[in-house]
């Protein structure tokens, strides 16, 4: 099997991001981003997606977290697009429901080649540990725009904002794992009647 790995660097006047991934990993993760709550959520993607992730970012955190969070999403999306290759033989679609106490979230993904995000998370607080939760919209928008996926995220219930967000990221990791899995019956075939994605 071809190794599905990628390393991407993205440098702007606002951030310098390095991202390495292995889609067929074991969930190992290392982060040096400077935004602890984001790192905690990225760890959920690695662990539940069985994706090895190594991300470093030096950003303009003296202003706020916005550019760092968005650019990490963009760079992760670029790494996914590179590592997934031509998409032959993958399941393409993935979905997951994940609970955490009172919270329940659903994530559905399609490696369609068409970027689109529908995200409905009615946060009960504006921040968690000083982190502006609205920035997760920017993270996922950056990811879908560059991974070229369609992504639906719904928090179905929950009143603890940390739990709401954590269920989203765990479900995202599990949906990714399902979608990128190699389907032996589709080996070498494109999972689309168009013949391309």
From Swiss-Prot:
Pfam families: IGPD (PF00475). It is found in: Cytoplasm. GO terms for molecular function: imidazoleglycerol-phosphate dehydratase activity. InterPro entries: IGPD_sf, ImidazoleglycerolP_deHydtase, ImidazoleglycerP_deHydtase_CS, Ribosomal_Su5_D2-typ_SF. The keyword Ligase does not apply. Its EC number is 4.2.1.19. Belongs to the imidazoleglycerol-phosphate dehydratase family. The keyword Amino-acid biosynthesis applies. Its main location: cytoplasm. It catalyses: D-erythro-1-(imidazol-4-yl)glycerol 3-phosphate = 3-(imidazol-4-yl)-2-oxopropyl phosphate + H2O. Pathway: Amino-acid biosynthesis; L-histidine biosynthesis; L-histidine from 5-phospho-alpha-D-ribose 1-diphosphate: step 6/9. GO terms for cellular component: cytoplasm. Keywords: Amino-acid biosynthesis, Cytoplasm, Histidine biosynthesis, Lyase. It is an enzyme of class 4 (lyase). This is Imidazoleglycerol-phosphate dehydratase. GO terms for biological process: L-histidine biosynthetic process. SUPFAM superfamilies: Ribosomal protein S5 domain 2-like (SSF54211).
